[in-house]
């Protein structure tokens, strides 16, 4: 009698292990940046991985070494083929990833975006640092805090002409300049393509080309420190350097007075929120406009309609979660942040 009982117990044990393995496999989330090796994205990845540990899900942070559609598509396809249940991606292009993402959704993978969006029909929820109006307004307000002249020359400098988020912010910033500072001349808009060396060369080129430039507006984690370094190299500390980057990267420029203020949001929290939302989708299936989610140590976030981003597309299970706050960093508050 003992042998059959032992066999049954062994079978139950094997089945239990199989079920446990299946549950863990169903809780794998991929978190993809535009590229690896940039502090901003690394910090977002750290937040994502930390949230995964809190929730008991497996989070993999990986991205291409250069910001390309092909690199991100390859990663997306790899994660789908490995059986990941959710993918959260900062898109290098609003349309370029869509075929791969739509294929993934047809296979049951939950697709979210963070930092930089795709077209909304190519994902479910976008974890958004701020609306174009909010972030474009921040850029102009930070510039106006330093450029007091009615007649001024400003340059825009960021990652690329195709990246979704930054182009939306810049479009709003330019509209705000036209409406509120009609005497400001936008002399150029240039790009560093997420390359530190090219970004520094481009920033120095802007400063050399316009000796009477009043401000560089650089809403990009590579472009802003490059603009600050270029101003130091060329001894052009009369130029207001504003934009978006991480406090740890920008702290030396703030301490030396090259930069007076710059902005961002808590990208670590953005990574955490992304994983909490992805996990909620895996648990419940959908989040719809008006739904709320309580996230420990962050607060309550809600799903807003795509229209807040200027989109016309609305659908069930589709919307935007906006981070609760954005931050302007100065000498007075920068040491409160470490990312």
From Swiss-Prot:
Entry-linked Pfam families: Peripla_BP_4
PANTHER family on file: ABC TRANSPORTER PERIPLASMIC-BINDING PROTEIN YPHF, D-XYLOSE-BINDING PERIPLASMIC PROTEIN
Its biological purpose: Part of the ABC transporter complex LsrABCD involved in autoinducer 2 (AI-2) import. Binds AI-2 and delivers it to the LsrC and LsrD permeases.
InterPro entries (alphabetical): Bact_Solute-Bind_Prot2, LsrB, Peripla_BP_I, SBP_2_dom
UniProt GO MF annotations: carbohydrate binding
Superkingdom of the source species: Bacteria
Residues spanning the signal sequence: 1-25
Name of the protein in question: Autoinducer 2-binding protein LsrB
Signal recorded as keyword: yes
Keyword Signal: yes
Coiled-coil segments: none
Gene, per the UniProt record: lsrB
Protein keywords: Periplasm, Signal
